[in-house]
Amino acid sequence: MTAAAVQIASQVMHADATLARIYAEAVRAAPADELVRAALLCHLAEPSTPAARLADDLCTSLDIVRAAYRACQGSAAVTRLVNSMYYPHRMRWSFATTTVQEWQRVPDRPERIRAHEPVLSETVEIHPTRGTCNYRCAMCLWSDQQELTYATKQLDTGGLMTAGGWIRLLGELRENGVHRLVISGGGEALINPELPSILTRAAELGFEIHVYTTGFSIRPGSPLFEALLRCHRVRFSIHSPEPITYDRIAGTRPGQHALDRVVGNLGALLCERDVLPTVGIGFVIQPFNYDQIAAMVDFAADTSADWLDLRKDEVGVTDGLTPDQLTVVRDQVRAIRRRPPVDTRIDIGDELVSIANGHSPDRSRTTECLGRYFRPTIGAYGHLTPCDLKAEPRFAQTGYDLGSVKRSQVLDVVAVSSQRRVADDCVQCMPSSRTGNRILHKLLDDLASGIRLDEQPFS
């Protein structure tokens, strides 16, 4: 066993006193074997490490790693740890669990991915927008609507997708095993007058529908409002609990009373829903609002939102936070973790958890981008891209355009592009894509090493 690997892992799992306590509870439930516990420690400290590499790092066997993985399966203590606001890889673990379940439902999927055969993910993001947004959020990919546009990036060929085109596409996606539809990006979808018919058809086809919106354009009682009530999750982007800061970030005018209007729409959805949709808030930390995190938690609880996503600007649109500002952020997140609200779930992104724990976030890359296998995206003009970031004008590059679904069936586009290798070398990469890439590479490497899906710790 190499002391260096264990020491590094121990630093991660003991970076915070509460994290260390929860981790200790997980270890107590594990076998007493020293090597198994070392493997468990290193795995929990970085769950995307392939089993063979973990065995090499510890100078041990795959059987020891398997034993550590078994210690995770069905362990209530491990479940408490990996679902904790103190665990820096909570979202990574959750993604791994979902992926293992998906691959177990479709057993040939890993082999098809490895062979670069056509594969359509169970989750697809679509951008049924008008190719624009009525906000100018400072940290958003749409903050620049002059130079970084579909036209300047040569993504506007053939015009926008029509409502009929989207509805045809929905049928193709459903027929080919897609069941989760994410409507996020490409501008603000809710200002597209055709969106109600698109959402209604998606609901009729049985999709699980997630919508991300500013919330400004919702009108209670309208066809759009009724369509949103048929969705599963609706997340409002609210980046300040204070009207002045909200307007400064969003680019809205004081006379619009935008924050009040958005909060009213959020409340109307909560009031009119049956069981679904769940309704939450997304808050992106940036120089304008870095000191408002605690106030935002109170705000979310006061609105009765089901959850609040706390994230950093993780693709560098705004200026980075200074060391002093990061200290303010860290102190607020630590205070929130000690006393979270009772009824509103606080979802802290992995990067923020690392910062609160006193560690630098992990932004390492892999050898190949596999984003097309877990969240491919279809942009407003019908271009299929490997991920949501490459469908946006700010980060789009024609080399990442996998084809158009406007004139071809989506599975044909996937098939034609399946042999194209996509390098994991983009200037920026969304945290969800970094997470997905790391986990897919781990699972594929593990299968090649003889670790079955039902042996994974995420099973």
Model-derived segments and spans:
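Small disulfide-bonded, cysteine-rich extracellular recognition modules and tandem repeats
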Residues: 57, 140-143, 249, 372, ...
